[in-house]
C-alpha cells in the first residue's frame, strides 16, 4: 500500500507538561501514524501543549471552557489536506492512565482521530458517522500494530 505524502511540523510548547512528552513522540512515529490515516497528501502541524494553552484554545474556538485531548483546525481538505492538530499533554496522559493505555497508544489514536477530522470525517453529525469513524480508526490502528482503542 502506497502512503500519501506528508509535510509535518512537530512542535512542543515551552511548557513542562508538553515537553515531558517529547520522548514519547519521536517525529518518525508521529509521521507514520498520521500517514496511515491519510487519503490525500497533507501538510500538518502537530502541537503538543499544556493545560493552560489547551483550555484557552478550546474556549476560544469551541466555546468550551476546559482543556480537551485533541483539537483539529482544518483549513483545506483537497487536493492537499492542510491542518493543525493540537494535543493537550496532561489530558492525554490522564486519559491514557484512566483507560489503561500507554501514552504511545493514546497519542497514536488521537493523531489518527485528528487526521481523519482534517479530511472531513466527523463523529458529531450522527451516530452512523460516529460508528463509521470508530471502525475506520480501529482498522488504521490495528494496521499500525495497536489494539482497538474502543475495546472495553
Swiss-Prot record:
Its cellular-component GO annotations read: cytoplasm
Q: Provide the alphabetized UniProt keywords.
A: Cytoplasm, Endonuclease, Hydrolase, Metal-binding, Nuclease, Ribosome biogenesis, rRNA processing, Zinc
Top EC class per UniProt? hydrolase
The record's cofactor note says: Binds 1 zinc ion.
Task: Say where the protein is mainly found.
Answer: cytoplasm
Q: Supply the EC number(s).
A: 3.1.-.-
Name the family: Belongs to the endoribonuclease YbeY family.
Report the NCBIfam families cross-referenced here. Answer: rRNA maturation RNase YbeY (TIGR00043)
Name the job this protein performs. Single strand-specific metallo-endoribonuclease involved in late-stage 70S ribosome quality control and in maturation of the 3' terminus of the 16S rRNA.
- Name of the protein: Endoribonuclease YbeY
Source species, please?
Acidovorax ebreus (strain TPSY)
Amino acid at each position: 500500500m502506497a502512503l500519501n505524502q506528508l509535510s509535518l511540523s512537530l512542535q512542543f510548547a515551552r511548557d513542562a507538561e508538553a515537553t515531558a512528552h517529547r520522548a514519547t513522540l519521536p517525529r518518525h512515529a508521529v509521521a507514520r501514524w498520521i500517514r496511515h490515516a491519510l487519503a490525500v497528501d497533507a501538510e500538518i502541524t502537530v502541537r503538543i501543549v499544556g493545560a493552560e494553552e489547551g483550555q484557552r484554545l478550546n474556549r476560544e474556538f469551541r466555546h468550551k471552557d476546559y482543556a480537551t485531548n485533541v483539537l483539529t483546525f482544518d483549513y483545506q481538505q483537497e487536493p492537499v489536506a492542510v491542518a493543525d492538530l493540537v494535543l493537550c499533554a496532561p489530558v492525554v496522559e490522564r486519559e491514557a492512565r484512566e483507560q489503561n493505555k500507554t501514552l504511545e497508544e493514546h497519542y497514536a489514536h488521537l493523531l489518527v482521530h485528528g487526521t481523519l477530522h482534517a479530511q472531513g470525517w466527523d463523529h458529531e453529525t450522527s451516530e452512523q458517522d460516529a460508528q463509521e469513524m470508530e471502525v475506520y480508526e480501529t482498522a488504521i490502528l490495528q494496521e499500525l500494530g495497536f489494539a482497538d482503542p474502543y475495546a472495553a
